[in-house]
Amino acid sequence: MSYVDEVIDLIVKENPDEPEFHQAVKEVLESLRVVIEENEEQYRKDALLERLVNPERQIKFRVPWVDDNGQVQVNTGYRVQFNSAIGPYKGGLRFHPSVNVGIIKFLGFEQIFKNSLTGLPIGGGKGGSNFDPKGKSDREVMAFCQSFMTELCKYIGADTDVPAGDIGVGGREIGYLFGQYKRLQGLYEGVLTGKGLTFGGSLARTEATGYGLLYFTNAMLKANDIDIAGKTIAVSGAGNVAIYAIQKAQQLGGKPVTCSDSTGWIYDPEGIDVELLKEVKEVRRERLTAYAEARPSAEYHEGKGVWTVKCDIALPCATQNELQLEDAKTLVANGVTAVAEGANMPTTIEATEYLQENGVLFAPGKASNAGGVATSALEMSQNSQRLSWTFEEVDSRLQTIMENIFANVDAAAKDYGFEKNYVVGANIAGFLKVVDAMNAQGIV
């Protein structure tokens, strides 16, 4: 049995009931076979893959808080500090009922390679809780965040582990978490990113993942002699990533015609009105039915169906495993040219393989959605220097980072005989940097 297969079997055996984590490890290691086989004997001797796929530290804790009725509620909190070979742990916090240790480990493992690809000195980690902020009052959200940070603060710091937002954790939650950290530790430092502009946040952080997705996608299209101008684009999601991907796509001349939330989706053949979408989702915090009511050209459909729309480019920006094999078949039948992931692992392995087999350009999330964490690292830089850069300066650095990520991914794919396979290219480019750092630091 090969070393890769041994480690995959070990992960499945030692981490039962964690299918998302199994999927992430399998996808990465399968694509790294060609690299690992070159040094298999040495890697096996150093147990390099075992060290890579096991977190350095895994923290699980209870989070008690009091709701508006005076009832004590108890949730579970997690922080998985996966790999610090190239810098402090860096990765978001997710507050959602679906959160469990397997999902946090999958996200943390992916984060190692994503952070490595940015070229910035940040390691991989992830955290969160099964708390659902939806339907909670501001006071309840604050009570939960303060209790969560009371435990988490023991394990994080500006040079140790710097969490950020993710699903269910926006500016409000980051503010409450930062306030509690400062109160408990007596330190005003860049311990969290995604902060408000009045207390150490970075301009362009909100837009970063969506903008970065389009910078990467555009670089990929240009390398394949395709012009984004005039292309029809299907986008899923209606959160930060989707909204700002739509906005940047329009600025580059593309025509996004869809978006979605947890209850349904919008098809707007005239192109999504991004200002109306921001009003509905960011200001009024309403469902997409409100968008359709205010926009005569828009059609609202319940359930799922974004990928049934005929498009040139598909941007899954909602959640993991949302684009499945049947969706991939529909997209290919409708003539899709490129699929670029805005969310974390939104495409199943089967769907990814089908798209690639049918000549569709595929950008994996660890490369194409790295704009968010890259700009988080730029926020860390500003905090450590006590500086604040302009929007244009941050955006310009982001564009350069994303174009460099594509260039490195493209080069790694070509070097190992996988031209235009950006999944393999991203995994190889991210892996080689982390492994080099791990080897240099010894068996730790």
Q: Residue spans of the language-model regions?
A:
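Conserved active-site and cofactor/substrate-binding residues in soluble primary-metabolism enzymes
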Residues: 2, 16-23, 27, 43, ...
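Glycine-rich phosphate/diphosphate-binding loop of Rossmann-like nucleotide-binding domains
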Residues: 193-196, 201-310
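Rossmann-like adenosine-cofactor binding region
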Residues: 264-362, 367
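N-terminal ligand-binding/catalytic initiation module
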Residues: 1-203, 433-442
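General beta-strand structural signal in soluble alpha/beta enzymes
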Residues: 160-164, 187-192, 235, 258-261, ...
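Buried hydrophobic packing segments
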Residues: 104-108, 177, 213-221, 245, ...
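Adenosine-phosphate binding glycine-rich loop
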Residues: 2-24, 220, 332-444
